[in-house]
Amino acid sequence: MLDWYISVSFGELTLKGKNRHTFEKRAISKILDAISDYKIEEYYQEQGKLYIKADVNDFDEIIDHIKKVFGIVYISPCVKCEKTVESMQDGVLKIIEGKIIKDKLQTFKVDVHRVDKRFEPKSPELNPLLGGTILKKYGNYVKVDIKNPDFFIYVDIKDNCYVYTDRIKGWGGLPIGSSGRGLLLLSGGIDSPVAAFLMAKRGVRVDCLHFHSYPFTSQRGFEKVKQLAEEVSYYTGNINFYSVNLLPVYKAITKNCKERMMTIISRRFMMRIAERIANENKIDALITGESLGQVASQTIQGVSVINEVTSLPILRPLIASDKTEIIEIAREIGTYETSILPFEDCCTVFTPKRPVTKPRIYDVKREEENLDIEALVQECIDNMELIKIRQ
């Protein structure tokens, strides 16, 4: 009897040695959460893959949800066969039916992977045998090409036998939560949502912190950033969205510090506030969308001065990326169109005409002596808002 399943192949999880079981268990949990709205008849693991049985009519939607789970290399609709040559022959005929395009000659190659080495005949004998079965029935539409075929027909012989042809690419990476927690400084721009996506791909559970300067920034600008957080949560899962009004800090800097120091000093305040929130919520690291040289504060000297105010690691996944590369990812994950909506954020509203690009820590600290740092940080945190974004 032939049954349709979805097979899920894990990526780096297979390299995790003794921790592999823990990583796979976490990934499977995320997959089942992602497809919980669908009727799943059964699921099980077999030698490095997860197999899911569901209604074939739901396959496209189920696969679309599974693709968004990090830790997966590819997904394949497959036919489960009995471990006999006859059943495999039926399996390859069933799987190729959907690949044949009438009136267009296509080429294929059979690729047998015999995990169970006790099974006979061996792969070099099975490949032409199964290929011959296909040619006998569909020789008018397909032919064999072992060097450059239009598609492969894969046959995995394990405890059971599975036949498939499509390998639908997943995002790879590691399952969410397997690499700790991070607090993303989320602006309204293109970069920070991409940074969130990339860190989530590495297994980091991401929460978001947004700084605004209402009423100098608009409510519509805030709603834009909240929408970005919701779009990011499609990949990261549930997000705690912290909103902080940084206006008291900007006013104090404007009154007491040199204008050209505005950007670097305000960034240091952002890191101080972010560190407080992270420590109070057991978050392991801070995340930014900074890219080296992209704006005035994103120089090596600027990054060094910003780092000085926190003992937490600051993860910068975009630090060596070109803007075109960042935009490409933003388009792919669906955040680009929201990011380019024309609303200003606090960084653009209070940008000095000639910001310092190579700040020295001594000069910055001397300017900060004119500020009551702890009082300003506390004032911002006291007025913080928290929005829980849930999938």
Swiss-Prot record:
Catalysed conversion reaction: [ThiI sulfur-carrier protein]-S-sulfanyl-L-cysteine + a uridine in tRNA + 2 reduced [2Fe-2S]-[ferredoxin] + ATP + H(+) = [ThiI sulfur-carrier protein]-L-cysteine + a 4-thiouridine in tRNA + 2 oxidized [2Fe-2S]-[ferredoxin] + AMP + diphosphate; [ThiS sulfur-carrier protein]-C-terminal Gly-Gly-AMP + S-sulfanyl-L-cysteinyl-[cysteine desulfurase] + AH2 = [ThiS sulfur-carrier protein]-C-terminal-Gly-aminoethanethioate + L-cysteinyl-[cysteine desulfurase] + A + AMP + 2 H(+)
Q: What class of enzyme is it?
A: transferase
Signal peptide (from-to): none
> SMART domains given for it?
THUMP
Q: Which Pfam families match?
A: ThiI (PF02568), ThiI_fer (PF22025), THUMP (PF02926)
THUMP domain location is 60-167
Task: Please give an example of a GO cellular component term from this record.
Answer: cytosol
Location within or outside the cell:
Cytoplasm
Q: Which residues cross the membrane?
A: none
Q: What does the similarity note say?
A: Belongs to the ThiI family.
Which PANTHER family did the record assign? TRNA SULFURTRANSFERASE
Its recorded name reads Probable tRNA sulfurtransferase
Q: What is the lineage of its organism?
A: Bacteria, Bacillati, Bacillota, Tissierellia, Tissierellales
Name of encoding gene:
thiI
